[in-house]
Amino acid sequence: MAWYAYCIVEQQSVQGGIRARRPVPVEGLKGIADAQIFAYPSGDFSVLVSEYIPTGDLGQKALLQHAHVVSECFKRTTVLPFRFGTVFDTDEALRRAVRLNRKGFLESVIKLKGKAEMHLKLLIKDGSLREAMEEIELPATVGSEYLSKLREKAVRQRERQTKARALSVQVHKIFSPLEQDVCCRKVNSGGMLIDIAHLIDHKKVEKYQNRFQMATRHLPGIEVVMSGPWPPYHFITGKRSS
């Protein structure tokens, strides 16, 4: 039997004080292809799974159904999400994955209990970045021109990194997260998009959201979009994969 995996939770969070030995149906929760969700016990944990029959590539609908299961579990307890598309071909493969990663799972549960993830997207469109965002094409042959272009490319990369770092520090001061994960990339409009994930206490979500207006005032010329709370995808120890 193949299992599609959604997330890992502490066994007691879905089964109370009962120590299950076999997969237990989770009432009112459906997964990909509207399949019944089961809590598959493995030591201190339960893996939220559904029976999996390959029918081709998993599309957008499956992605939304995967996210729905993780979000519903997140409302009740701490979750360690699996990457979308994670499938275990056998019961033993599933149990082995949990057994081999048990230490990392325990560390993540302790770290993330009572925590949530918030997202901020900062779109920078001001003219000061236009030159820094232009990509430098390297000549096909090695020589003085190649080295000159290579240096120019490195300078522009540092300019982008410096701008992103300065903004992330400013945003950190406004929102005071426990941890943050930052990445930036060029967008087609010629600007730069900085994607920031913040780890915060779940009880402080409203306080965090209330600081949004402050952020927009302190970041003129920058479009700021907030979303969350989400399960803490960016802050899990190690990777959850088959």
Model-derived regions, located:
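An interfacial alpha-helical scaffold signature
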Residues: M1-S242
